[in-house]
Amino acid sequence: MRKLTIGGKVIQDDGNCYVIAEIGHNHQGKLETAKEMFKVAKECGADAVKLQKRNNRELFTKAGYEKPYDNPNSYGETYGEHREFLEFGGIEYKELMDYADEIGVTFFSTAFDFSSADFLAKLDMPAFKIASGDLKNIPLLTHIAEFQKPMILSTGGGTMEDVNRA
């Protein structure tokens, strides 16, 4: 039987579902909104809450980062400014980790790039989520695996060959 432990909870083939509430960037760059979402997720029975961590300059070309972003839901004049507004740094992550511990919900994040993975590893996240778009990103998967933490892989759009390779 396969077993995985995240945040002290054992996840296994014949066990209960492990419910992860995807917060992503729906907190809109506001720490208090993220905390409220953590609280509601816990109240609804989630075992874990998950954010997304990106180094936008690493992921986007200079042109993409500096592209004007004229959108009613934009948090900046360029796409890069918009994306940066949504990112939490170390201080916010630490506060959210403490809050998650306080309310009894496990907190981890998706790492979209190498520096984000390193950032999360330094915070001693209990697990890493891998986005389906990175299922074939073997260098990133290998890098994250070196942290010796559980990895949850999204497989949407992937083939069984992709899943087995990952």
Functional labels for PLM-detected ranges:
Residues M1-I20:
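N-terminal amphipathic alpha-helix/helix-capping segment at the start of soluble metabolic enzymes
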Residues R2, L31, K62-Y65, G89-Y93, ...:
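Active-site-adjacent beta->alpha loops and helix N-cap segments on the catalytic face
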Residues V19-A21, V49-L51, F107-T110, P126-I130, ...:
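Hydrophobic faces of well-ordered beta-strands that scaffold small-molecule active sites
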Residues E22, A41, L120, S154:
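Conserved, mostly hydrophobic/aromatic
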Residues E36-N55, L123-D124:
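Catalytic domains of carbohydrate-active enzymes, especially glycoside hydrolases
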Residues G45, F119-F128, E146-M151:
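Glycine-enriched alpha-helix->loop->beta-strand junction motifs that scaffold or abut catalytic
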Residues D47-E87:
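Glycine-rich, proline-tolerant flexible connector loops at the mouths of alpha/beta enzymes
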Residues N71-I138:
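Active-site beta->alpha loop and helix N-cap motifs at the rims of alpha/beta catalytic domains
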